[in-house]
């Protein structure tokens, strides 16, 4: 099978994304970095961020070498795994790490330049920050599609399988590089989350509550570590998370498409089904770039106007992609192109609804957060209670939206043939529709990730302006940019969680295809079904596999798997919350020590030891991230070896359902506490320094690990467990107790 000409649109779009990202980076570097003091502060943050990243990558490299050797043994020693897996695993991790490095480098160079641009105008500051954030967005989608293109070309050339099984083998092999991306994302999210919140909690508790000094005050020893943490967690961490979702959704959908049309007379349609998600992602890149250029605002713009400025770019790109999808699938000539286009639209709309719901429950422009701020009048306890309650209620809309998106995407893909909804062919097409809905949701990632990466850049710009002593007009502009960044960051977290849920569901369906390959690898060509009939493994449907492995709710191994999966979300959150607590204790003690021992800090005559706080956060994050991160790799392997395929299916379902709901709750509760504090700081309920303010600072401090460590890391937990299960499918088939 030759590679069709239309495929080359995919690597071409990847190259365009990287070229535009490079142009934005060069444009940002040409901006003036400001006064000597602004440059000095930016250099402190830059050195701290890069020191952390170097240390993290050293640890991750050791883990990758060990896992790659293990996969090499399974492939070449035990013979239970595809021989390409070790190499695919390494490239997935490499490209994910590369995206994080470029994003972090850009963000740390952009903050002072954004603050300096804000000295000219609000619009100038917005453009510098947003286009610097766009570097992260475009690098993620560019490197993601480049990696996918590379592996498709290599495997198409070297996989020596004929007939419809060739594309099945190619797509299931490509899917395994997602584990490399997932593993790298796991360490980036968990380590970055622990780092940033240890610094943030330490800076807030001692600086704001005990010493009574403002946020980002240069007298606070933890303030540089806090600024470094914004980049570590919200740029490198978020980028790795969404890189994993982006690649995972495209690859899982391609694998489902290859399986749905794996018949001798359907090979042409099979190729179209594999190419469709790649082409939608490729066109999405180009249209996202157009949206990025549309973002601008006027001087003195209100928060609603600033949000509208970003919304113009995102919504315009979404509308263009929605229209382009119909054209792509029609010209491709794929079966039921109209229904599949509607599945893509379903994903796009679901992403927008989840983003809007997140904004409603976390922005102080709306009642839920206003009520939390009002509850501060009776102390910190009521702030905590109100935030927990609001976070729990906020799960309803995202869960119902994802549920509606799943059923609509499924029905659109099968042409609303509800009478035969569970027929084998319709089930394959329906699952393909769900996968392509996930691709639709992530097709705007080039610009949606730009709005998210913009947040920490604007936050650091505000910190730089505060520490550099810039005038009140500049601080007013950077505060406006920072407030916008807080809202986009919260919305971005909701988007990341929703996309993770749809991607994990597509990966769950793809797991069955890996089981098929695992059976064939182990020389099993026939399934003896419980009803007394037999079916060739190559031709078996998903329903045949469900019956063969007895994946029903009456099977105790499935139930055990569901309980373990549900428990994993809470166990993981507990471990990461405690990790932040321990690291924050070290930071609090260090800041107190410096206030006590270094004379003149609070009067501005002494200089804090910023480097010591950066070092404490770095060491704490590296030490604390190992166990939670490795847990997500070890548990799926152990469940597979003990309870087999049925147990793993239960594990993935339990982890997906509990992880999704818990992630929404934690992200929204944390975001609401943060913005309730900001509302009080704007002068409501007594303003800064009041008892209400101190109560909201406590709420914000509790919410920090909720929204920036445990909550976002659950996205990767549910995807990584799926990816590990997929990669280890051959071992699970060959060796299990039950």
Question: Language-model features: where?
Answer:
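Hydrophobic packing and interface segments
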Residues: 1-738
């Amino acid at each position: 099978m030759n590679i069709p000409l239309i495929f080359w649109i995919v690597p071409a779009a990847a190259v365009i994304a990287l070229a535009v990202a490079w142009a934005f980076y060069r444009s940002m570097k040409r901006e003036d970095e400001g006064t000597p003091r602004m440059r000095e502060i930016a250099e402190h943050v830059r050195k701290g961020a890069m020191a952390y990243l170097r240390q993290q990558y050293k640890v991750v490299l050791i883990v990758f070498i060990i896992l790659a050797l293990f996969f090499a043994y399974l492939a070449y020693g035990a013979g239970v795994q595809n021989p390409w897996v070790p190499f695919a695993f390494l490239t997935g991790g490499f490209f994910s790490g590369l995206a994080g490095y470029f994003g972090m480098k850009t963000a740390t160079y952009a903050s002072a330049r954004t603050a300096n641009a804000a000295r000219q105008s609000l619009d100038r500051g917005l453009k510098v920050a947003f286009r610097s954030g766009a570097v992260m967005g475009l690098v993620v989608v560019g490197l993601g599609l480049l990696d996918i293109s590379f592996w498709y070309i290599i495997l198409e050339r070297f996989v020596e399988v004929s007939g419809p099984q060739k594309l099945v083998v190619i797509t299931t092999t490509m899917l395994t590089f997602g584990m490399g991306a997932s593993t790298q994302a796991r360490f980036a999210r968990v380590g970055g989350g622990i780092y940033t919140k240890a610094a943030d909690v330490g800076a807030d508790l001692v600086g704001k509550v005990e010493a009574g000094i403002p946020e980002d005050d240069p007298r606070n020893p933890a303030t540089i570590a806090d600024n470094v943490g914004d980049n570590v967690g919200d740029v490198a961490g978020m980028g790795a998370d969404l890189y994993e979702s982006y690649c995972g959704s495209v690859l899982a959908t391609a694998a489902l498409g290859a399986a749905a049309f794996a018949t001798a007379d359907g090979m042409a349609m099979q190729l179209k089904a594999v190419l469709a998600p790649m082409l939608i992602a490729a066109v999405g890149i180009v249209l996202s770039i157009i949206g990025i250029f549309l973002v601008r605002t006027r001087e003195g713009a209100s928060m609603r106007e600033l949000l509208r400025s970003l919304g113009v770019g995102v919504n315009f790109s979404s509308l263009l992609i929605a229209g382009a999808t119909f054209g792509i699938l029609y010209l491709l000539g794929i079966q039921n192109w109209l229904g599949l286009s509607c599945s893509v639209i379903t994903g796009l709309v679901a992403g927008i609804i989840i983003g809007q719901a997140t904004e409603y429950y976390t922005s102080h422009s709306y009642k839920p957060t206003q009520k939390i701020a009002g509850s501060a009048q009776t102390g910190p306890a009521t702030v905590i209670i109100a935030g927990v309650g609001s976070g729990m209620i906020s799960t309803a809309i995202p869960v119902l939206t994802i549920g509606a998106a799943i059923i609509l995407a499924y029905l659109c893909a099968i042409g609303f043939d509800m009478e035969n909804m569970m027929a084998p062919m319709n089930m394959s097409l329906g699952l393909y529709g769900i996968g392509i809905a996930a691709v639709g949701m992530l097709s705007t990632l080039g610009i949606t990730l730009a709005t998210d990466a913009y947040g920490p850049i604007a936050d650091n710009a505000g910190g730089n302006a505060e520490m550099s002593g810039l005038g009140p007009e500049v601080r007013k502009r950077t505060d406006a940019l920072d407030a916008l960044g807080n809202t986009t960051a919260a919305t971005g977290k909701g988007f990341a969680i929703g996309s993770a849920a749809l991607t994990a569901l597509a990966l769950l369906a793809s797991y069955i295809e890996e089981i098929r390959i695992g059976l064939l690898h182990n020389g099993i060509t026939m399934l003896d079904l419980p009803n007394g009939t037999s079916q060739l493994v190559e031709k078996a449907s998903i329903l045949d596999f469900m019956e063969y492995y007895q994946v029903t709710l009456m099977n105790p191994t499935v139930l055990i798997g569901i309980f373990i999966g549900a428990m994993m979300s809470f166990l993981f959150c507990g471990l990461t919350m405690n990790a932040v607590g321990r690291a924050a204790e070290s930071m609090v003690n260090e800041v107190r020590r410096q206030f006590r021992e270094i004379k003149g800090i609070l009067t501005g005559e002494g200089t804090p030891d910023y480097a010591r706080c950066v070092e404490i956060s770095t060491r704490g994050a590296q030490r604390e991230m190992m166990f939670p991160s490795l847990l997500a790799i070890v548990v799926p392997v152990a469940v597979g070896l003990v309870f087999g395929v049925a147990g793993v299916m239960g594990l993935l379902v339990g982890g997906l359902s509990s992880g999704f709901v818990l992630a929404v709750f934690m992200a929204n509760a944390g975001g609401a506490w943060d913005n309730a504090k900001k509302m009080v700081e704007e002068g409501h309920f007594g303003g800064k320094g009041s008892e209400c303010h101190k109560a909201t600072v406590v709420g914000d401090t509790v919410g920090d690990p909720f929204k920036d460590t445990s909550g976002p890391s659950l996205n990767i937990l549910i995807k990584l467990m799926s990816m590990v299960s997929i990669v280890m499918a051959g071992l699970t088939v060959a060796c299990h107790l039950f």
